[in-house]
């Protein structure tokens, strides 16, 4: 719509009717948009800001990049469409698996935090990774509630519902009875 609008000093007119039909006009450009009543949209939950972690945007972007490829693309198992995000003390761990591959990435945090274990949708992490600037000096705060996660950085807030359930028992999968073990 913005590209179709003409020059700098044009007048834009926006009109809506009782059925939420909106007409946007600017010189010769006319756009008609069908809207909805705001009450039909789901509510935006309030997230308490008492349970959170802080890390650099660069670090979050990197650990997402290093684990997101092993998220399952289909919904046959809901757990595999997300990543386990686990905070223990001053360590953040992201885990993803798709039935063939498993990715685990651990990073040290600057502070001690209370233990947190949630499953974040892969689509949410993919979108977060795209909009993070990746600057090592810029921080992102991640807030947790029972059913939601909220990322706050720069002038951006991203809120997502968590995947409910118990993630796979990774420690049992990583038993020590392998013939060959490679650690990178």
Which stretches of residues belong to each language-model region?
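Structural preference for solvent-exposed beta-strand-turn elements
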Residues: 1-184
